[in-house]
Amino acid sequence: MSGSGTVAPVYDFKVLYVKLSKDFRVIVIEKLGYGYSDICDFVSDVDTLVSIQKRALEKLGENGPYILMPHSMSGIEALRWMQLYPDDVKALIGNDMTTPLTYSIWTKEKVEKKIKLMNFATKYKLYWLLCPISNRCLTGEEKKQHKMLRKRNAFNICHINESKAILDNVAIVESQGYKKCPALIFKSNGKQTAGHWSECQKEFASILNAKLISYDCGHYIHHYKSNEMCKEIIKFVDLLII
C-alpha cells in the first residue's frame, strides 16, 4: 500500500516485492491516481478508499485474510481496513507508516499549505524535483515507464483530494481506536519526515505490542534496506503460521 504521491507503486516497490515474491504472493495496490490506474475527481474519504481496494482484490479472485503493508500515509487506510474488515487482516507490516498519532499536530492551515505547494509544482512542472523516483531493480523499459507515470500522475486531483481529506480520515480512524493484530513496524531515521514521526511509531508499536525495527535511512526504507526487510518479514510471517 503506497503513501501519498507515490507516482508508480508497481515500480517504486519492485526492489522489495521481487524478493518477497519468492516466498509469498504479493499484490501491489495502485489506487486511483496512482500508477496505471485511472485519474478521476472523487471524494477521498477513507471508507471509500478502503472499499475500492477491497472490491478490486475480490474481482481478481483474491480473498483475505491479508497481511497489509502500508507505506507512509496509507497507514491510515490500513488501520481503517482493520476496523471495517477485521477478518480480512491477518497481520500488519508498517513501512515508516503514519497513524493518527502522526497527525496530532497537523492543522487545516498545514494541509492548505501542502495543497498550495502541490498546485504550484503542477503549474511549473516541478514533479522532477518534488517527486524523485527510484530506478532500483528496474529494466530500461520500466525506467521509461516510471518517468512517464511521474509526469502523468504527480500532484493529480486524486492526490490533492487525499490531502484535503486527511484530517477527517484521521479523525474517523482515531474515533474507533486501534484493533490489535500481529504487527511488525519498520521505522526510518526520521530525517525525511516530521520531527515527531519516529516517536509516534514507537508509541504505536507499543500500543500494538509490535516488533519495531529502526534503520538509519530515509523515509522510503525499501529503497535502501530491501534485503534486511525481506529477511525480517520472512521471520515474522513464519511465526504467524507456527
Task: Label the model's feature ranges.
Residues 93-122:
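Flexible "cap/lid" loop of the alpha/beta hydrolase fold
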Residues 217-228:
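Catalytic histidine-centered segment of alpha/beta-hydrolase-like enzymes
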Residues 28-69, 85:
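Active-site loop/oxyanion-hole signature of alpha/beta-hydrolase fold enzymes
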